[in-house]
Amino acid sequence: MTITEQKAAQRKAGIAARRALSDTERTHSNAALCARIMALDCFKKAENILLYAAFCGEADLSALAVEAARQGKTLAYPVCGEGFSLTAAVPGPDGWEVGAYGIRTPILSRSEILRPDQLDLVLVPCTAFDAVCHRVGMGKGYYDRYLPRCTRAVKLGVAFEAQQVDAAAVDAYDEKLDGFVTEGGLYFGFDTTEL
């Protein structure tokens, strides 16, 4: 099986696993993973955070977004553009639309744009992940192109335990993350003393 075929299989299995969670499991899991993220020093210290609006059964960070906003943190959301580009947009109160792939997305003309090097923390969704912080995304490479430019940010994947695989199918274009947060634990591929 090729890497592309392995990624497709892991993507399909990971999406099915997260969709299979009951409403009760999903509610408890979302609360637990948001609490884990908010307990990390990298969250506490972050001023500018890129997160995402949950789609297709992804881990929901709404509770984290509410608390982060209450703390005065700046919250940006990804906008997918031409050429598989990604922009971190801070939407105004009336600055939302349903964008590419049916995802709730900021309207760029009604948003402040943050450069990648302004971000302190990037929370990345995935379809599958492994314990050494590799991820399988949706297959377009938006985050893989964007993350190398986030030079000062801690980059954390967010997923449910059910999405973990023994070894994520990755190639030279896939960006390894600094860590992963799930409802059940934390996975880090480096020294965690700074987190």
Spans of features found by a protein language model:
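A residue-level signal for conserved active-site and pocket-lining positions in enzyme catalytic cores
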Residues: 14, 51, 75, 123, ...
